Amino acid sequence: NGQVDAVVIDNEPAKAFVEQNEGLKILEENFVEEDYAFVIAKGNEALVDQVNETLRELKDEGVLDNIAKNYTGTDEEIGKYPYEILDVERTNGTLTVGTNAEFPPYEYYEEGKITGIDMDIMQAVCDKLGMELKIEDMAFDSVIPAVSTGKVDIGASGFTVTEERKKNVNFTDTYAKSKQVIIVRDTSVTAEKTGIAEKFYDNFIKDSRYT
């Protein structure tokens, strides 16, 4: 309805949104840093421990850094560090991941396939654990309930760690940090206000990603 003048969101999704929508810019001021982690059902501490141990290994091996650089690095780095699925035995079942693939660069569709930082990390975790990866795309607000009820094993959807969410699910160790920034209209560029406002609402407000 044209009433959205600014929105505070995480830096990397902000950059992706501005690149795709003319008439917007990111202010230079940064705000608080937020921790990103994956979510697992309460009572499934065994999976929490497995994922945390695997994340530590991937960090020590430089895999997490390379995945991040492939999507959010410098112009020279982006696209140069694609994660390559390992040829390993997958005898330990399937890890079902719940996500909302509308949050680039963490999860989004490309050529009909869900990709992004979170999905590459989940694939790397499965490679380490000898598991198949299955991705379930759903509404953002459905991911935590799906985790809690056992519909999926783990939620990977750019989740910030909050006390409110801790009441319902367990968080893994932090795998990424993101600074919050403000997107505003760039008055030097002509853009269709209503269209931008609707995109703000659909991408960042409707799903309550930051609560």
What are these regions (language model features)?
Residues 1, 10, 38, 51, ...:
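Hydrophobic residues within well-ordered alpha-helices
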Residues 1, 43-45, 131, 160, ...:
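A conserved helix-loop-strand patch within extracytoplasmic ligand-binding domains
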Residues 4-32, 142-145, 157-168:
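A ligand-binding cleft/hinge motif common to bilobed small-molecule-binding domains
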Residues 10, 43-57, 63, 117, ...:
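Short amphipathic alpha-helical coupling segments at ligand-binding clamshell hinges
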Residues 11, 15-52, 75-88, 101, ...:
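Periplasmic-binding protein-like
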Residues 50, 66, 90-161, 166-167:
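Extracytoplasmic small-molecule ligand-binding "clamshell" domains
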